[in-house]
């Protein structure tokens, strides 16, 4: 069953209007965006007696530039909350996505605040890659007149925790910037740290920037701000799972599911390139195993966010059980005085390796101890939703949303283990069962505003998902632009995801070219990056014709391998060295012609 949305919460723009608005504002500076914001306010309120929000006179007061560098939306939410805090304090603030920021103006910034996440192997979020490269290049200016603060979001289950924030913080200081505050590194449960940091930032900036009269306050926002919905990460839609179909062969080593979710009459809107956030329930069997290993019953009362719940319920719905971290291992070892785990304490590399290879339940099984229920809860991290690239376009499927789910399953000493969200969707939600979802908008992975622009799509494995959405959208609009797909997986007969659909697009002319890489169908392993090199001359022709390049999939290896291949193609066929090719690719990124959705 779905919960209907109030009409006032529906998105006021259709996808076409949204695309035109994004195209029109792509090249504007923060100051120009501020003027446009005031202009539209004036259009809407021509005779109102209220004071319009207009830019402060240049030179009268230093503005605060607030840069949001977000991958999954958390950094953006923190930045937007800080913007609201600064406005409430009557401070002059400009909020801008890192991807929209004209980074060559950074030398003129007086007060700079960056909120950033980290992705992959310690890399900046996609929208901040160009800014990061610029600051670490020889072109970076001195920032002796800039005062700055950095808030960094990360995940301690990854080795390079908060590395992007550390990079920005150290480089800004190295370039001569003055720290307003020490950098804060926040884990998955970031809300309390963010709230405290925001209050400190406001206090510090009050002493550095004169308080503005309401008529002087400037508030500009990222393009993300135009998305409105009553359904959010904290208030998800109760939707219905309508289709769960395995789309890999019976002999495939992979279990990949095509999932369709009915949004009903909720009015929830999304665009190709967006992600679907899915809240999930931990496997009750896993909860039972963990509870029994600790000689508990599951009915013990525990406190979660100020509420009292039975232990089993808290573990099923509120805490992460399928991803271990070095901090959890270290804290469990210290708490239980485990003889097998204590030698790992203080050794970061060993802790990381153990956490990556040993799920929480098996850590407990291998190092049995007796914990009370609240001690167990205090050891764990809060459950967070999983994000899946959307594999459909509403222009075709209307009130549905489709995702492509690779089911995580493996074995630990004969015991079956599985990913929390993927096994929930694949095995524990029945058709017509309830799934709590929300849309995570991603304006950094969008089709070209001009429908005649050629598109190159590189998506091995489940990375093919957003390109199914891209093709549905382009087919529904009847666009004339050329489309080229690079896809790879182990075997043609077992792992060609959405094979019939791609063959239909080729037959009907919607898909101009398709190059397939099957890594296990021959002695020599072939991957999508090999196909890119093989088609280098034609690929360069497409790029010269203005093609937009999109990459989706694994951030740890594939994305880097694909980027290396692209650089080699650009260097060879563009007649330049690798350093120049890297600058060329960076320019494509700035122009939104090279976009990645990697995880």
Curated annotation (Swiss-Prot):
Catalysed conversion reaction: hydrogen sulfide + 3 NADP(+) + 3 H2O = sulfite + 3 NADPH + 4 H(+)
Cofactor(s), by name: FAD; FMN
CDD domains attached to this UniProt entry: SiR
Binding residues annotated for FAD, in chain numbering: 322, 356, 386-389, 404-406, 410, 419-422, 599
Domain Flavodoxin-like: 64-202
SUPFAM superfamilies given in the database record: Ferredoxin reductase-like, C-terminal NADP-linked domain (SSF52343), Flavoproteins (SSF52218), Riboflavin synthase domain-like (SSF63380)
Keywords carried by this UniProt record: Amino-acid biosynthesis, Cysteine biosynthesis, Electron transport, FAD, Flavoprotein, FMN, NADP, Oxidoreductase, Transport
Alphabetical GO biological process terms: cysteine biosynthetic process; hydrogen sulfide biosynthetic process; sulfate assimilation
Subunit structure and binding partners: Alpha(8)-beta(8). The alpha component is a flavoprotein, the beta component is a hemoprotein.
Family, per entry: Belongs to the NADPH-dependent sulphite reductase flavoprotein subunit CysJ family.
Purpose: Component of the sulfite reductase complex that catalyzes the 6-electron reduction of sulfite to sulfide. This is one of several activities required for the biosynthesis of L-cysteine from sulfate. The flavoprotein component catalyzes the electron flow from NADPH -> FAD -> FMN to the hemoprotein component.
Name of the protein in question: Sulfite reductase [NADPH] flavoprotein alpha-component
Designated gene of the protein: cysJ
């Amino acid at each position: 069953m779905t919960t209907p949305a109030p009409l006032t919460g529906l998105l006021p723009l259709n996808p076409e209007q949204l695309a035109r608005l994004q195209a029109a504002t792509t090249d504007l500076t923060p100051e120009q965006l501020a003027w446009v914001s005031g202009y539209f306010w004036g259009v809407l309120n021509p005779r109102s007696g209220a004071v319009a929000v207009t830019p402060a006179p240049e030179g009268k007061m230093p503005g605060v530039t607030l840069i949001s560098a977000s991958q999954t939306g958390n950094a953006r939410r923190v930045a937007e909350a800080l913007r609201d805090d600064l406005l409430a304090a009557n401070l002059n603030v400009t909020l801008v996505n890192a991807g929209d920021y004209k980074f060559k103006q950074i030398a003129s910034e007086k007060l700079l605040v960056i909120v950033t996440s980290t992705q992959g192997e310690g890399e900046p979020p996609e929208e901040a890659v160009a800014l990061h490269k610029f600051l670490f290049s020889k072109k970076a200016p001195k920032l002796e007149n800039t005062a700055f603060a950095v808030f960094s979001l990360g995940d301690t289950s990854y080795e390079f925790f908060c590395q992007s924030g550390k990079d920005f913080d150290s480089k800004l200081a190295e370039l001569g910037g003055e720290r307003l505050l020490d950098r804060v590194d926040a884990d998955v449960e970031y809300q309390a740290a963010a709230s405290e940091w925001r209050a400190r930032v406001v206090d510090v900036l009050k002493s550095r920037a004169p308080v503005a009269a309401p008529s002087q306050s400037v508030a500009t926002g990222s393009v993300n701000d135009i998305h409105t919905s009553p359904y959010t990460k904290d208030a998800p839609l109760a939707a219905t799972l309508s289709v769960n179909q395995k789309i890999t062969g019976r002999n495939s080593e992979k279990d990949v599911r095509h999932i369709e979710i009915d949004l009903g009459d909720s009015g929830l809107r999304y665009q190709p390139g967006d992600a679907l956030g899915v809240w999930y329930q931990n496997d009750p069997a896993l909860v039972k195993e963990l509870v029994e290993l600790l000689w508990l019953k599951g009915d013990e009362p525990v406190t979660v966010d100020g509420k009292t719940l039975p232990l089993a319920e808290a573990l099923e719905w509120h805490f992460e059980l399928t991803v271990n971290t070095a901090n959890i291992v270290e804290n469990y070892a210290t708490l239980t005085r485990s003889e097998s785990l204590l030698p790992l304490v203080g050794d970061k590399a060993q802790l990381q390796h153990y956490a990556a290879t040993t799920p929480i339940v098996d850590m407990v099984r291998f190092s049995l101890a007796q914990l009370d229920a609240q001690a167990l809860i205090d050891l764990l991290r809060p459950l967070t939703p999983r994000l899946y690239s959307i594999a459909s376009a509403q222009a075709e499927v209307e009130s549905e949303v489709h995702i492509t789910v690779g089911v995580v399953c493996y074995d630990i000493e004969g015991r079956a283990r599985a990913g929390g969200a993927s096994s929930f969707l694949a095995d524990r939600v029945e058709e017509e069962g309830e799934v709590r979802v929300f849309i995570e908008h991603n304006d950094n992975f969008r089709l070209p505003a001009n429908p005649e622009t050629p598109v190159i799509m590189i998506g091995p494995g489940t990375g093919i998902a957003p390109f199914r959405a891209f093709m549905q959208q382009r087919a529904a609009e009847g666009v004339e632009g050329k489309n080229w797909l690079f896809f790879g997986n182990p075997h043609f007969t077992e792992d060609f995801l959405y094979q019939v659909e791609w063959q239909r697009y080729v037959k009907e002319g919607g898909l101009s070219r398709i190059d397939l890489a099957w890594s296990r169908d021959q002695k020599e392993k072939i991957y999508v990056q090999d196909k890119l090199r093989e088609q280098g001359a034609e690929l360069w022709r497409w790029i010269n014709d203005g093609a937009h390049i999109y990459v989706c999939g694994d951030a740890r290896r594939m994305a880097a391998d694909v980027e290396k291949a692209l650089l080699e193609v650009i260097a060879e066929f563009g007649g330049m060295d690798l350093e120049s090719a890297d600058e060329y690719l960076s320019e494509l990124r700035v122009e939104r012609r090279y976009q990645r959705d990697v995880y």
